[in-house]
Amino acid sequence: MTVRWAYAFIDRPYEEFGAACDFWARVTGARRSELRGERGQFATLVPYEGGGDPCVKVQGVAGGPGGAHIDLAVEDVPGESARALSLGAELVFSEEGLAVLRSPGGHLFCLVSWLGERAVPGAVDPAGRLDQVCLDTAPGAYAAEVDFWAALTGWPEVPCSSPEFRLLEAAPIQLLLQRLDSDSPPSAHLDLACADRARARAWHVAAGAVPVRDGRAWTVMRDPAGGLYCLTDRSP
């Protein structure tokens, strides 16, 4: 597969959709697009003039707490969808220019038509750069899930210092696969690369987020819409 571009999709309860758009637009240095969808449940976060092409979208979901997923932009959605199915994915929904699929480990993702996006947006100091979707995967499904995403995207794997992580590197949005300690249902969250995590944490708190816990090289945060995400010690 030739992935031309990728989007981090922020999924939040529909009732919190406005709060999610406002917060993440501020985090990413962007403005919210006109709403799309039958209920106005989709929005793109468009970087301000000269800030690059969009790579973040927001969706209001009807059931559950939401989370995140990745959209892969390709030139041939039907062809790449068929290839994903051959690798073990399951087709959930399709229409012209869109295929919604489920990975072997249960993660939803989308293939969408590439619209010529190529300019990677810059980081917002000190908020960091939203550049990663982390797929939280049960131990029994983890190895096969890593193999699936590596084969699907063709993105190079970068060694990680901790064995529970596998990174598939790309821009503007890359994939981190995390092996969970228990057989929990699959989930996904957003990661931001932060040059100074303590400073970024203070910025996010001032913007309305709440710290949840600190890890070795990350801080788990809760956004104003109730979604979890991480600030991580990486160069933005």
Label the predicted regions.
Residues 1-21, 68, 72, 112-147, ...:
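N-terminal beta-strand motif that seeds the catalytic metal site of vicinal oxygen chelate
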